[in-house]
Amino acid sequence: CVGMPGQTLEIKDKVIYLDGVANKEPDNVQYSYYVATKRPIGEKLRRELGISKEDLANHNANGTYYYLPLTQKAYETLSKRTDIVEKITPVVEEHGQGLYPVNKYTGWSVDNYGPLWIPKRGETIALTLDNLPFYERPIAVYEGNDLQVRDGKIYINGKESSEYTFTMDYYWMQGDNRHNSL
């Protein structure tokens, strides 16, 4: 669990911030890289780098161009292997697709995301058409309300609503393999 109810989460240049304070990264955090090699990465090096067989399978037909999640240690080890490696390039996503909320274009990416307030039971937010995409699913699906937008106005259970009080706590979960966690 990364974010707790009532906290504001933001990711800036891959660093997670909670309520404006940088979160310590786990020791084995992974980021994705494009890796061009002179020949396929062998089993011994795969094990040394801690790369799963599934991740190593993500390559081109001749096994010389990979999309790999690497820890800092694996990145440094692989960078020194000039006998195998031609180039390692960090994956940089300018604008993420399939990121929450999926019903609003935010311009956010997995490396630069938010800020997003995590709902807390008993807390009330001003509800606007601008922030509705962030909270529509919790309000309608998880808390079981009938939520509709008609003529530019928000209705919850048939009543026009400009605010909402959450009845449940929510959490932000994110794994160590950051580019495959959102």
Residue ranges and their predicted role:
Residues C1-L182:
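Extended hydrophobic leader/signal-anchor segments used for secretion and membrane insertion
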